[in-house]
């Protein structure tokens, strides 16, 4: 069968944090319900265990788009930010389950094998005109042709992503004012900076054994650790994704950006630099001590810090999810 391509995960995705997320975090994710019907209609047969999970993988998405562009001379994008997670236990190597796609036109399935290093499965891929057998080792990615179904043999945990052909993504911004702070999980927001009077920032909040706030503000990098009380507040329900709707544009039409008030963000937090670190304070959340590499710009830092506080208080669909962390890209006027 033409068009079946297998990559090593590390060779396809050039982003260490996302690779670690794929390898380590998917088995802990809770099931999600507010999902595109095209994802729900992936039929999973046999005795396999399955789940529908959030899968924000921007670097994987870009890599798949590059591969498909070279094959089809067209761009592709994810149908849904969610994915099907399947766990197959089949020690006697007999075929188990059939994964029969709902088959909307021009859908490209991408299958990621995760789990134990020794796990190996075979994909028995079939279409209306041909069939093929592909071995998929752990931490490998198979990009399949359009309009196919597949059986499996062996042991594996599989993530199934659905892509389709797309035109260029619509701009995120329509009209802005200098009193806007705009955030999104989409990195392309940074490409729509209105002018040089605006700055970019990136925020990641991770809460596992401790809570870490990582910020890049106008090129300056901060790595902040929460005190114990603050960690307790941040870590509560960190994996709760039940309120997240899809943004597939066929079933759900959630906005892809959020506009916040710059004055509120500027006055919503405080920071103070001493000889050792930057002390950061978020009312109703807590305190952080941060290292810093770069120029100290207190107003910009306070805006980004207040955005972090907004994310902690409002865990909805706007930020991207990555295991025990969530992240957002932002822009604001200087």
Curated annotation (Swiss-Prot):
This protein's UniProt keywords: Early protein
UniProt induction comment: Expressed in the early phase of the viral replicative cycle.
InterPro entries per UniProt: Poxvirus_A51
Family per similarity comment: Belongs to the orthopoxvirus OPG181 family.
Name assigned to this protein: Protein OPG181
Origin species: Vaccinia virus (strain Western Reserve)
Gene transcribed to yield this protein: OPG181
């Amino acid at each position: 069968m033409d068009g079946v391509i297998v990559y090593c995960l590390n060779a396809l995705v050039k982003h260490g944090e996302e690779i670690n997320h794929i390898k380590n975090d998917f088995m802990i994710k809770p099931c999600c319900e507010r999902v595109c019907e095209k994802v729900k209609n992936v039929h999973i047969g046999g005795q396999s265990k399955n789940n529908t999970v959030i899968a924000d993988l921007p670097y994987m998405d870009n890599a798949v788009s590059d591969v498909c562009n070279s094959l089809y001379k067209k761009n592709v994008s994810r149908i849904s930010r969610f994915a099907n997670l399947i766990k197959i236990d089949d020690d006697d190597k007999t075929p188990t389950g059939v994964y029969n796609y709902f088959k909307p036109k021009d859908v490209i399935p991408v299958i990621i094998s995760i789990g134990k290093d020794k796990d190996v499965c075979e994909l028995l891929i079939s279409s209306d005109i041909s069939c093929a057998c592909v071995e998929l080792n752990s931490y490998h990615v198979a990009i399949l042709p359009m309009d196919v179904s597949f059986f499996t043999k062996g042991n594996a945990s599989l993530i199934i992503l659905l892509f389709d052909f797309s035109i260029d993504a619509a701009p995120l911004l329509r009209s802005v004012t200098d009193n806007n702070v705009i955030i999104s999980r989409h990195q392309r927001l940074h490409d729509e900076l209105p002018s040089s009077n605006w700055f970019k920032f990136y925020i990641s909040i991770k809460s596992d054994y401790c809570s870490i706030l990582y910020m890049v503000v106008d090129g300056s990098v901060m790595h902040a650790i929460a005190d114990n009380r603050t960690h307790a507040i941040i870590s509560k329900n960190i994996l709760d994704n039940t309120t997240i709707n899809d943004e597939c544009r066929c079933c759900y039409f959630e906005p892809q950006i959020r506009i916040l008030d710059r004055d509120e963000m500027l006055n919503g937090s405080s920071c103070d630099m001493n000889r050792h670190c930057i002390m950061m304070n978020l009312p109703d959340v807590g305190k952080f001590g941060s290292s810093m590499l770069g120029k100290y710009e207190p107003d910009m830092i306070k805006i980004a810090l207040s955005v972090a506080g907004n994310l902690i208080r409002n865990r909805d669909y706007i930020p991207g999810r990555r295991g025990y962390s969530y992240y957002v890209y932002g822009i604001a006027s200087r």
